[in-house]
């Protein structure tokens, strides 16, 4: 028997995803036409003997989350429930807090994954790898290869090349340690809770001492990466399974467009029915495009590559859309152009208007390059990135919006470039 836990964070997390996370919890943001979390759940549902999927986070229960859980349970025929943390407890603290629920029924092992990663999720391969390495270890980490410079932005894993044992783990080192990075997808046995428990007890002692000595409240946080993996490395307790498949983080809104491209490409193998095709009376499709069945699109529009069109979207004649996500209820009027952008819910782009961003893709000449987590500002100016229109933004006709972020409910009356429009 197996279970899966997905860590979905909370409203204080994912701030780099604003203004899109104002309207919907980040894990429910649509990537390649379906909520981000659905890609995880689809992968979990394909694992034999998977009995339950748990979502752990500190969002208040809300209608969107409840609707998503209900529809996912109906579609995948597997129990899914949300466990709400009383505070942000960290990647290890959350699962330790709910250890009784996770261990109920006696699972032999459980998957743990972060919601903000995009991957092919090789869960079956990880399970087979786990079984090949015997009974005595307590976890398998999914790893991938990054280049030397970008590896410093991730948890770095030093492995024994013959046995794949994790010998050393450092979270975001200041100097180069290894080009194998942590993907945020794990397979644990119940033994992991004994190790988390030791750290939790030690932290409790330090917390009490700190409060007695200085009167400061310390959060009850246990971090898997810094507190658990670093301590267990080199003790034959952790192993790393290296994947050659695609993997990326989804930290910023710009990375959502890149993740959408990866998933749309994967649909050729997994869900070809989700990809739009060129047929009579339909818009011209170039490359991989997802179109919701309720969207109303003029046949003279040209879409793709890497375009996702949401529910109830209206697209007029002569419109060009490329490398973009168009969200629920948006209207693109005749002959407008949308490139490298996310158009928010119920927003309108006027006739002959142009909404354009700068792609934040990995270096195409480096096979191990990852997407850069750019800071919003650099050298006193806004870093050029994709353009984001928040919910219910109105772009008038013949206006150009380039490399800008527009917060929700704005009626613009002129062109903007490299600005955050509050």
Swiss-Prot record:
GO terms for cellular component: cytoplasm. Keywords: GTP-binding, Nucleotide-binding, Nucleotidyltransferase, Transferase. Disruption phenotype: Morpholino knockdown of both gmppaa and gmppab results in muscle damage and shortened motor neurons. It comes from the Eukaryota. GO terms for biological process: GDP-mannose biosynthetic process. GO terms for molecular function: GTP binding; mannose-1-phosphate guanylyltransferase (GTP) activity. PROSITE patterns: HEXAPEP_TRANSFERASES. Coiled coil: none annotated. The keyword GTP-binding applies. Residues 358-386 are annotated as: C-loop. Residues 275-422 are annotated as: Hexapeptide repeat domain. The N-terminal substrate-binding domain adopts a Rossman-like fold and has a binding pocket for GTP or GDP-alpha-D-mannose. The C-terminal domain consists of a series of tandem hexapeptide repeats that adopt a beta-helix conformation. The beta-helix forms several protein interaction surfaces involved in assembly of the GMPPA-GMPPB mannose-1-phosphate guanylyltransferase complex. A loop extending from the C-terminal domain (C-loop) is involved in interaction with other subunits of the GMPPA-GMPPB complex and may be involved in allosteric inhibition of GMPPB catalytic activity by GMPPA. Component of the GMPPA-GMPPB mannose-1-phosphate guanylyltransferase complex composed of 4 GMPPA subunits and 8 GMPPB subunits; the complex is organized into three layers, a central layer made up of 2 GMPPA dimers sandwiched between two layers each made up of 2 GMPPB dimers. This is Mannose-1-phosphate guanylyltransferase regulatory subunit alpha-B.
């Amino acid at each position: 028997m197996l279970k899966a836990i997905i860590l979905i964070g909370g409203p204080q997390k994912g701030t780099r995803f604003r203004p899109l996370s104002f309207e919907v919890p980040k894990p429910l943001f649509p990537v390649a036409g379906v909520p981000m979390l659905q890609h995880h759940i689809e992968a979990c549902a394909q694992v034999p003997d998977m009995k339950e999927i748990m979502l752990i986070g500190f969002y208040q229960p809300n209608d969107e989350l409840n609707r998503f859980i209900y529809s996912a349970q109906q579609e995948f025929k597997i129990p899914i429930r949300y466990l709400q943390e009383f505070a942000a407890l960290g990647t290890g603290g959350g699962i330790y807090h709910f250890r009784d629920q996770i261990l109920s029924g006696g699972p032999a092992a459980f998957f743990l994954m972060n919601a903000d990663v995009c991957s092919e999720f090789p869960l079956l391969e990880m399970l087979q790898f786990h079984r090949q390495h015997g009974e005595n270890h307590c976890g398998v980490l999914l790893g991938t290869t990054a280049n030397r410079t970008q590896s410093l932005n991730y948890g770095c894993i030093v492995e024994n090349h013959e046995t794949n044992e994790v010998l050393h783990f450092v979270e975001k080192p200041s100097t180069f340690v290894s080009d194998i990075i942590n993907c945020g997808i794990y397979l644990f046995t119940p033994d992991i809770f004994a190790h988390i428990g030791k750290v939790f007890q030690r932290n409790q002692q330090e917390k009490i001492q700190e409060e007695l000595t200085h009167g400061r409240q310390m959060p009850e946080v246990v971090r898997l990466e810094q507190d658990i993996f670093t301590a267990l490395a080199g003790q034959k307790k952790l192993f790393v399974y290296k994947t050659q498949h695609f993997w990326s983080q989804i930290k910023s809104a710009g990375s959502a467009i890149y993740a959408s491209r990866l998933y749309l490409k994967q649909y050729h193998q997994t869900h070809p029915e989700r990809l739009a095709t060129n047929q009579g009376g339909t818009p011209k499709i170039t490359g991989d495009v997802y179109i919701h069945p309720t969207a109303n699109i003029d046949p003279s529009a040209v879409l793709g590559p890497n375009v996702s069109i949401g529910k109830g979207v209206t697209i007029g004649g002569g419109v060009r859309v490329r490398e973009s996500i168009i969200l629920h209820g948006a209207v693109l009027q005749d002959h407008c152009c949308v490139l490298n952008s996310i158009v928010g819910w119920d927003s309108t782009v006027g006739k002959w208007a142009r909404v354009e961003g700068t792609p934040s893709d990995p270096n195409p000449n480096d096979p191990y390059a990852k997407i850069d987590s750019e800071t919003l500002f650099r050298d006193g100016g806004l870093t050029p990135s994709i353009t984001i229109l928040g919910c219910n933004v109105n772009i008038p006709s013949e206006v150009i919006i380039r490399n800008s972020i527009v917060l929700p409910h704005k009626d613009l009356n002129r062109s903007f470039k490299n600005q955050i429009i509050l």
